[in-house]
Amino acid sequence: MATKKAGGSTRNGRDSEAKRLGVKRFGGESVLAGSIIVRQRGTKFHAGNNVGMGRDHTLFATADGKVKFEVKGEKSRKYVSIVTE
C-alpha cells in the first residue's frame, strides 16, 4: 500500500486580474472624438483642452486632433490636451 502524508493547506494562491491601465494614445498621435487616451487610478494626468474625464478618471478625446502632453502650473501637473487641426 502506497503511503503519502497529506499536503496540508495554503493561504496563498490569489492574485487580482491586471486592469490594463496606462497611456493608450501617445503624444503626436491622431485621435477621434471619444477615443480613450489614458486609463488611470486617480489623476496622475489631468484633462486639458478638448479632453474629458470619466468617473473612473479615464481621459478621453472630446474632439478630433492630435494628442499633446504638457507639464503646467505651480504644482507641475501633467495635462493631456487635444490640438485640433
From Swiss-Prot:
Region (Disordered): 1-20
Any one GO cellular component localisation term in the record: cytosolic large ribosomal subunit
GO BP of this protein: translation
InterPro entries in UniProt: Ribosomal_bL27 (IPR001684), Ribosomal_bL27_CS (IPR018261)
Pfam families, A to Z: Ribosomal_L27
Keywords (A to Z) from UniProt: Ribonucleoprotein, Ribosomal protein
UniProt KW Phosphoprotein keyword: no
Sample GO molecular function, one term: structural constituent of ribosome
Family according to the record: Belongs to the bacterial ribosomal protein bL27 family.
Protein name: Large ribosomal subunit protein bL27
Source species taxonomy: Bacteria, Pseudomonadati, Pseudomonadota, Gammaproteobacteria, Pasteurellales
